[in-house]
From Swiss-Prot:
InterPro entries: Ribosomal_uS8, Ribosomal_uS8_CS, Ribosomal_uS8_sf. The gene is rpsH. GO terms for cellular component: ribonucleoprotein complex; ribosome. Keywords: Ribonucleoprotein, Ribosomal protein, RNA-binding, rRNA-binding. Pfam families: Ribosomal_S8 (PF00410). The keyword Lipoprotein does not apply. It comes from Thermosipho melanesiensis (strain DSM 12029 / CIP 104789 / BI429). The lineage of its organism: Bacteria, Thermotogati, Thermotogota, Thermotogae, Thermotogales. This is Small ribosomal subunit protein uS8. Part of the 30S ribosomal subunit. Contacts proteins S5 and S12.
Length: 134
C-alpha cells in the first residue's frame, strides 16, 4: 500500500521517462485521470487510456519523446511532487507559482477542479499545488 498515490504516479512517469519506455501502467483514480488529462493537453504525454480490470482500473500512459528512435530527447525534463500528505502546500490567486519562468506548469487542485497554473490565473482561483512539471 502506498502512502501517497500521486507521488507514486509521478515517480512511475519519471522512471519510464528516464529509460525511454513507450508506456507505463498506473493504478487508476479520478484524480490521476485528471492529472493525465492535463499532461496530455499540455503536450507532456502522447495519450492515456483507462483499462477496466475489475478492481480500481489501470491508466496506461503513452510516453512522448522528440526525435527519432535513435536520437531521442525527453519532453518531460523534470517532474516534482510539491504538496505531500505530511505537508500540504496551498497558494492563493496572488501567489500562483511560475515553473521555470513559464516554461513548465504547476498542477493545482482547486474548487474548480484540477487545473494548471495558467488556467488558475485566468479564472482567478488558488488551491493546493500538486506538482511541477517542466
Amino acid at each position: 500500500m502506498w502512502s501517497d498515490p500521486i507521488a507514486d504516479m509521478l515517480t512511475r512517469i519519471r522512471n519510464a521517462n528516464v529509460v525511454f519506455k513507450d508506456q507505463v501502467d498506473i493504478p487508476a483514480s479520478n484524480l490521476k485521470k485528471e492529472i493525465a488529462e492535463i499532461l496530455k493537453r499540455e503536450g507532456f504525454i502522447k495519450d492515456y487510456t483507462y483499462i477496466e480490470d475489475g478492481k480500481q482500473g489501470i491508466i496506461r500512459i503513452q510516453m512522448k519523446y522528440k526525435g527519432t528512435r535513435r536520437n531521442r530527447e525527453r519532453v518531460i525534463h523534470g517532474i516534482v511532487r510539491i504538496s505531500k500528505p505530511g505537508r500540504r502546500i496551498y497558494v492563493d490567486k496572488e501567489h500562483l507559482p511560475k515553473v521555470k519562468n513559464g516554461l513548465g506548469i504547476a498542477i493545482l487542485t482547486t474548487s474548480k477542479g484540477v487545473i494548471t497554473d495558467k488556467q488558475a490565473r485566468e479564472i482567478g482561483v488558488g488551491g493546493e499545488v500538486i506538482a511541477y512539471i517542466w
